[in-house]
Amino acid sequence: MNYKDTLNLPKTDFPMKAKLPSREPEFLQEWESNNLYQRVQQKRSGKPKYILHDGPPYANGNIHMGHALNKVLKDIVVKFKTMQGYDSPYVPGWDTHGLPIEHQITKTEKVDRKSMSDVEFRKKCHDYAMKYVEIQKEEFKRLGVRGDWDNPYLTLSPEFEAEQVKLFGEMAQKGYIYKGLKPVYWCTDCETALAEAEVEYHDKRSPSIYVGFHVKDSKGEFNEEGVEFIIWTTTPWTIPANMAIALHPEFQYSLIKSGEKHYIVATDLLETVAEEAKLGEYQIIREYTGRELEGIVCQHPLFDSRESLVILGDHVTLEQGTGCVHTAPGHGHEDYEVAQKYDLEVLSPLNDSGVFTEEAGQFQGLYYDKANKEITQALDKRGALLSLSFITHQYPCCWRCKESVIFRATEQWFASVDGFRQDALKAIEDVDWIPAWGEERIKAMVMNRGDWCISRQRVWGVPLPIFYCQECGHELITEESISAVAELFRQEGSDAWFEKEAPEILPQGIQCSCGAKKFSKETDIMDVWFDSGSTHRGVCAQRQELAWPVDLYLEGSDQYRGWFQSSLLTAVATKGESPYRECLTNGWVVDGEGKKMSKSQGNVIAPQDITNQYGADILRLWVASSEFKQDVRVSQKILKQTAEAYRKIRNTARFILGNLYDFTPEKDYVSFDQLEEIDSYILCRLQKVIDQATRAYDEFEFHEFYHLIHNFCVVELSQFYLDVIKDRIYTMPTESRERRAAQTTMYYLLDSLVKMLAPVLTFTSEEIWQYLPGDREESIQLTDWPEVNEELVDNELEQKWANFLEFRKEVAKALENARKDKKIGSSLESKILIYADEDLFKKLQSFEDNLEELFIVSQVELKKAEQLTETVKNQALSSEDVEQASIIIEAAQGEKCPRCWNYHPEVTKAEELCPRCSHVLETSNK
């Protein structure tokens, strides 16, 4: 007889192979056609809000692994909070203005900017941005990210631009906006100012020169002839703009004699300077403090008509150089700041393209970087060059064109951070920063930053809503003018600024304080960081489903100097507080060896490659498994490991589903007090897992959740509980309490597990959900997070089983050793004799009726340690001495039952059933 037909073997249509790359798009289509996002929001309507505000990615190019990591993290947070019962909408957004898009249009798409009007060029930029909004939108959706994709926010939308203008106006009305001549980062290739966050650093080879500035008037400090202050610089091109030499007031400076010349150098740097500047032998004549040398006048080394004043500054250090700092107020922030105290001219003899103007004298017409050679030669010719060498160092470069950038003083519009710096620092303290070091990082940045240069000399952006009186040149930024511009942008978009003249924009009758009524428009646009820094106002404060302030900002760690800061500054300036309560950062995605990904290195992995090869759920599981607050590694090896972990979780779910094929919860559910003890134990463990998982999600420790759930599925379920109950669920009568109890337990386990997995394995959890028996919500995304059932928590029971499982490990080792020694094949071929000490004997006695099932062997005898004899040991197949017991393995008595495969003394011949199986078949219909 074929006894297989009498067993309750698992059966399910749930596929063993996930086939995620082909299956996941079907789910996406299903969710979209069912309006799942709207249904989730409807269900949570009226509940407490939890708002994660999406930092806008830039609408340029396909998404990369950094985007994928960040977007999936956000999706995990939002889905978890929604399942917890919060109204947690997710409104994705895009940053759509700025230089990178202009650069793509002119450089990549070969558009001749000069052949078209501003409006025509802006139309091309608009279309380019919208093209990539759509491309990135589909790529984000493919990752399983749930959001209001039909209604994202865009910084180019008229409504957003209007709110941005109003925010600017409020800052202006509070006196925070001004125009000034200051050095700012300037890209000569893109011909515009840059924000600090738009600057990258790359290696560059630069000249390193030591130059002598001849003393013209020592103010009576020394009588020696031919005294020179030595400066060091790696930017010879800035020397034409030199106005001063800065010393530290407290440092010691030495007047030395070398040959026929005398030099002034910081005492602590003498040896280094003497060697590098090739001064040769020298003797110290006397020493001064920097303060004593203030006011000395030097001759400019290039121009006879110019002088260089010795001034004092606390920014001077002894880390490198000479302690005498070449100061060009038009080409350095610290130079500018210290020069203001001495009322020095801010000279910047370069045009927008980086070419020297007539103010540079003989160097007029030279590109600044090419002028290094000419200037060095001129210094040498005039006897001012002491030495020339070359160094490779980190140098600021434009984030878009990758060309070197310079500090250049130009007239720009600024936001005066000094006006609200202390309020910003206080607001930082009110935010919960994760990791905690983020607070000190952004504090230091805000404390030490200069004023914010908010103007850009481009056209693709939100225009600065400023007018100029044509009579007196005075700026017009009034509440009335701002309202007019904001309303115009709301109705027609910011293109209207470029299409209309000032009289068509301004209200009739508006006039300057001088009485004039004719105005012209500002031609600069706003910094794109002002765009994205306004999203809390233009999006969160405007959209009904959102709120202000929001609960969470979650972006890469580079945003401390970017979006976190620009958002904080605009919010504090206008509302006096931070726009976010909590700020969480993720690290960079690097390759398997921890190296930065780059096309030249050939180590780039794209999200599209992962979804096509493995599926989005594998990428999502990789995200969850990562300690994302640090840099996160990804490689084919890591992805294969993640796919293997996924397979084990999926197989656990499939095994359970296979054994619920005839289980209807409403009809077959066994009450908790009727469960077997092992069932109660595993459900107790489940409650602990739910508690720990909830805490891990709440604290954004997703990698802890990953390890917790993976360990529970693989070790506690697959390797223990589900393995142990196979005999019960396969061989016991279909309707028996014992079998239904196991099914009830498995059902409860999987129902809770799949809910905990839902924020991470968004596709697979939905697939499992559709196969789970019983009445349930149409989508798992409409369900609630599992809560701890205190009725199932039993700490004494948990400890009892924990102790047993420790001993079970020893039994498993003994069986494995016997298997390795070829003493047994299957563990069911074994009989185990346990000779235990008094304490262990008592503990095992309470399990005595189930030890065969728990050890998955055919027979077990529990004896006291003193009953063990050498004869027993010698006759055994194998024996192991462990703490508190000796484990003896013998061949099982009797023959194998053809139905349950257990050996039984009463089975003496082939095809003979054991007593249990005989009883089952006699009392069942099988």
Swiss-Prot record:
Q: Which SUPFAM superfamilies match?
A: Anticodon-binding domain of a subclass of class I aminoacyl-tRNA synthetases (SSF47323), Nucleotidylyl transferase (SSF52374), ValRS/IleRS/LeuRS editing domain (SSF50677)
Q: Name any one GO molecular function.
A: aminoacyl-tRNA deacylase activity
Q: What is its main location?
A: cytoplasm
Q: What is the annotated localization of this protein? A: Cytoplasm
Cofactor binding description: Binds 1 zinc ion per subunit.
Give the location of motif 'HIGH' region in residue numbers.
Answer: 57-67
Q: Which residues bind ATP?
A: K599
| KW Transferase (keyword) present | no
Keywords, ordered alphabetically: Aminoacyl-tRNA synthetase, ATP-binding, Cytoplasm, Ligase, Metal-binding, Nucleotide-binding, Protein biosynthesis, Zinc
Q: Which family does it belong to?
A: Belongs to the class-I aminoacyl-tRNA synthetase family. IleS type 1 subfamily.
Q: What is this protein called?
A: Isoleucine--tRNA ligase
Protein species of origin: Natranaerobius thermophilus (strain ATCC BAA-1301 / DSM 18059 / JW/NM-WN-LF)
Q: Which gene encodes it?
A: ileS
